[in-house]
Amino acid sequence: MKKYLLIAFSLFTLSSIAQSSKDADLLINKISKRYKKFSSIKADFTYSIESKAEKINEKQKGNIVIKGNKFRLDIAGQTIICDNKTQWTYSKEINEVNVQHYKPKEGIMKLDDIFTMYNKGFVSKMGEVVKEGGRELTILELAPKDKKKNYFKIKLFIEKNNQQIIKTVVFDKNGSIHTYTITNQIPNIKFVDGYFTFVAKKYPNVEINDMR
């Protein structure tokens, strides 16, 4: 499941970084403030992982809904639901759900921080502006201050005219590259809190593994 909490991709050189980190910090703060204003956000995305050493090249489509510290993630036949206390991981193929206490510190990053985590704990640099799909994207490069992290670099692709995060690229220390491209994002949709809990009666004959 952890691989689905990663975000990554891109090919451009480090020599393109020319502007000061102060400019990058200002942009990151703008992005963070923008997303923190939302009461909720729903995003459709494409996730891919590439590892030449392990000969892996996979791509999956998914969607995520975030409301405060709660989230619901659907990808690769799995639904991961969290109400900030309990996490349910449901596998459609075998009609089974694992229930456990939510421990955000065990993952690569907290899902509810995906859009706002970048304004803390990173050294940032401003990169070049590129064009993708007819849009101008500003590239930001971030390195975690905590060298114990599983990744050593993140690249953010930010739409220039509205500060939306379009693509995030995470580079693992083991050589893997994770790509997370947001294809659609809608803020401020109303979701009842019950949307972020697993209701067993909606899944007839589901096998429940309570690991708490």
Which residue stretches match the model-derived regions?
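Gly/Pro-enriched, hydrophobic low-complexity segments
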Residues: 18, 125-204, 208-212
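Extracytoplasmic
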Residues: 38-40, 59-61, 68, 82, ...
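Flexible, surface-exposed loop/linker segments and immediately adjacent secondary-structure boundaries
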Residues: 102-136
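Beta-turn initiation residues at beta-strand->coil junctions
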Residues: 47-49, 91, 169-172
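Sec-dependent N-terminal signal peptides
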Residues: 4-13
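N-terminal leader/targeting segments and the immediate start of mature chains
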Residues: 15-56, 69-70, 202, 207-212
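An acidic-aromatic
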Residues: 61-109, 178-179
